[in-house]
Amino acid sequence: MVIIRKAQPSDLDCLVRIFNLNIPKYFHKKELVDFKKYFNSNNIETYFIIESEGKISGASGYAYENKQTANLCWVFIDPNHHSNGLGTKLVNYCLDTLKRDNQLNVIQLETSNLTFKFYERFDFKIEYIKKEYWPNNDDLYFM
């Protein structure tokens, strides 16, 4: 059974373990500090955990840039659960939640050349690309 729930401070250790499993393919080790800062800020209110078979399998959230713009943030899944639809469920959950906000006009995200095609499935469009932007020299895709 799959459930999605709000993140709790006690989830951090498990999320760090899953984050580390995504290094170096999807994240650089330097990004872990940024993720921890994000998680330990007030953004935890809009950060969600996906559990599969009673175990945390990934997370995703969003942060408001202003009343009209939100950013999808820190989407990652345990590599052992990639291609099982968990990332899709989690992103859809965040997008459905955001779409209920009548003041919101824009949902955007920053991703890489490795994952932008995943977000195109949700109708995100590439606005611009910055070459070798991320610490591991992957390109930034702003969508």
Tell where the protein language model's regions lie, with residue ranges.
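Conserved N-terminal entry element of GNAT/NAT acetyltransferase domains
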Residues: 1-10
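Glycine-rich phosphate-binding loop
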Residues: 85
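Conserved acyl-CoA
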Residues: 89-106
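Conserved catalytic-core motifs of GNAT/GCN5-like acyltransferases
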Residues: 106-110, 120, 125-142
